[in-house]
């Protein structure tokens, strides 16, 4: 196998990079030493920022995320018994999205296996 880029690590970042490179016509292979069961079974963060949502859309894997995620406009912080709302939408004009990184990984693995640039996972 000949490729232009080798990406070490088949988590969400490596898979996303691989997909974005493919969309630009740059051949690559994503190498992962763990099993698919391990990679897809580990618990990861569940909040992603708008810029990541935009990257996932650009990579072609945003459809399920758009359908199943929850938009979250802010958080509440308690200090000395008083709750304070931090409204992201009002402060910066953006929200965060509740969609687990494990789900992002599932979406990216499905796409990478179609492109056949993911090595190491028994998909």
Predicted features by range, described:
Residues 16:
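Cytochrome P450 catalytic-core helices
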Residues 19-23, 110, 114:
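Short, well-ordered alpha-helices that flank and scaffold nucleotide-derived cofactor binding pockets
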């Amino acid at each position: 196998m000949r490729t232009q880029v080798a990406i070490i690590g088949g988590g969400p970042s490596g898979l996303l990079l691989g997909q974005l490179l493919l969309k630009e016509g740059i051949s690559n292979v994503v190498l992962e030493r763990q099993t698919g069961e391990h990679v897809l079974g580990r618990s990861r963060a569940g909040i992603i920022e708008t810029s990541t949502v935009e990257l996932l859309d650009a990579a072609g894997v945003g459809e399920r995320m758009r359908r199943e995620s929850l938009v979250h406009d802010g958080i509440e912080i308690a200090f000395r018994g008083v709750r304070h709302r931090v409204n992201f939408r009002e402060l910066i004009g953006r929200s965060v999205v509740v969609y687990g990184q494990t789900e992002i990984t599932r979406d990216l693995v499905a796409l990478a296996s179609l492109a056949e640039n993911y090595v190491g996972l028994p998909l």
